[in-house]
Structures are given as structure tokens and as C-alpha cells.
UniProtKB/Swiss-Prot annotation:
Entries under InterPro entries matching the protein: ATP_synth_OSCP/delta_N_sf, ATPase_OSCP/d_CS, ATPase_OSCP/dsu
A single GO cellular-component term on record: proton-transporting ATP synthase complex
UniProt family annotation: Belongs to the ATPase delta chain family.
Localization per record: Cell membrane
Gene: atpH
Species lineage: Bacteria, Bacillati, Bacillota, Bacilli, Bacillales
Coiled coil region boundaries: none
Pfam families: OSCP (PF00213)
Residues spanning the signal sequence: none
Keyword set includes Cell membrane: yes
Subunit structure and binding partners: F-type ATPases have 2 components, F(1) - the catalytic core - and F(0) - the membrane proton channel. F(1) has five subunits: alpha(3), beta(3), gamma(1), delta(1), epsilon(1). F(0) has three main subunits: a(1), b(2) and c(10-14). The alpha and beta chains form an alternating ring which encloses part of the gamma chain. F(1) is attached to F(0) by a central stalk formed by the gamma and epsilon chains, while a peripheral stalk is formed by the delta and b chains.
Described function: F(1)F(0) ATP synthase produces ATP from ADP in the presence of a proton or sodium gradient. F-type ATPases consist of two structural domains, F(1) containing the extramembraneous catalytic core and F(0) containing the membrane proton channel, linked together by a central stalk and a peripheral stalk. During catalysis, ATP synthesis in the catalytic domain of F(1) is coupled via a rotary mechanism of the central stalk subunits to proton translocation.
Gene Ontology MF terms in the entry: proton-transporting ATP synthase activity, rotational mechanism
Official protein name in the record: ATP synthase subunit delta
Length: 184
């Protein structure tokens, strides 16, 4: 079974528990933090994935590192240790977020801009692009990228809306290169 399919199964099981206990948002926040730590601390992954480190020691490391998370998240991590699948934690977190978003009718969006956007601008992007994405609402995160020169670039799931000056220049360059190839 592929890692993606396995991640979806664990995420679905955890999501069911979250629904029953009415902790969908809290568990999502916890998983986001856990994912960040797993990505940033490669040594943690190395220890948890090492076959010579006993499972009980791995669980103690998890308890010491993530003792403040909910029992459901901690026990999911323990289960992943028992089944030697701790490497799927970031994917599991991503799948859980997708399920939580579907449940709420929301989508995550990243708006790249040359300068930080105001709350009013972020709210405006959320309203306009929520309809475009077919969602009730968008959770917008703003990332500053001076390479855009001007305008904005918006990523919603795997869709990108590029209204940046850099994007327009790149499209003009490709168009001119295509015309030159036809002539040459």
C-alpha cells in the first residue's frame, strides 16, 4: 500500500475520533505543530525510524516532546511507532487538514505579495477567491515575495492564479521565445 493511502487511513481514523469528541480544530492545530517539528528536526525522525531503538524509548521521546497534545494525537503517534510508520506523520497531518477543510467547507490559500497585505486586503481575497475555489470560505496566509515585482500570486490547493508582474514578464518571454522558434 502506498504511503499516501496509509496516511489517508490513519488521518481518517483520527478525524473520526476528532468528530466524535468535537475536537476537529484542536487536533488540526496540534497536528500542524507536530508536522512542523517532524520536518524541522531530522534527528527526531532518525531516532524514531531507527530499528535498534526500542519502541518504549521512542514512545517516551514522543511523550516528552508532545506531552501537551491530546490523547488521540499522542496515541496515534504511539500506534505509528508500533507499526514503524512514523515517517508518514507530515503526510498524515496534510490529509487530516484536507478532511477538516472539507468538513468545514473551507480551503487553505496562500497569497504571495511584494509587501505584507492588510487584514482588509486578505479578507477581500478570501471573499473573491472562495467562490472561485468552490468553498464557503478561505483561510488565507500571506507570504511576502519581493521577486514578484508587483501584483499578487494566489495558490489554492493545486491551483495557481498568477497576477504578478513577474508572471506576466515570464509569459511574455515564453511567447517571444515561441515566436522566435517559429521564425528560426
Amino acid at each position: 500500500m502506498s504511503q499516501s493511502a496509509v496516511s489517508k487511513r490513519y488521518a481518517a481514523a483520527l478525524f473520526d475520533i476528532a468528530l466524535e469528541s468535537k475536537l476537529v480544530n484542536e487536533i488540526e492545530e496540534e497536528l500542524t505543530v507536530v508536522k512542523k517539528i517532524f520536518i524541522e528536526h531530522k534527528d527526531l525522525n532518525a531516532v524514531l525510524g531507527h530499528p535498534k531503538v526500542p519502541a518504549e524509548k521512542k514512545k517516551q521521546i514522543l511523550k516528552d516532546s508532545f506531552g501537551s497534545v491530546s490523547t488521540a494525537v499522542l496515541h496515534t503517534l504511539y500506534l505509528l511507532v508500533d507499526r514503524s510508520r512514523t515517517s508518514i506523520v507530515p503526510d498524515l497531518a496534510d490529509e487530516y487538514v484536507k478532511m477538516a477543510n472539507r468538513f468545514r467547507g473551507t480551503e487553505d490559500a496562500i497569497v504571495y505579495s511584494v509587501k505584507p497585505l492588510s487584514e482588509e486586503e486578505i479578507s477581500s481575497f478570501s471573499q473573491v477567491f472562495a467562490k472561485e475555489a468552490g468553498a464557503a470560505s478561505l483561510r488565507v496566509r500571506n507570504e511576502v515575495n519581493p521577486d514578484l515585482i508587483g501584483g499578487v500570486k494566489i495558490r489554492i490547493g493545486n491551483r495557481i492564479y498568477d497576477g504578478s508582474v513577474r508572471g506576466k514578464l515570464d509569459r511574455i518571454e515564453r511567447q517571444l521565445a515561441g515566436e522566435n522558434r517559429k521564425k528560426g
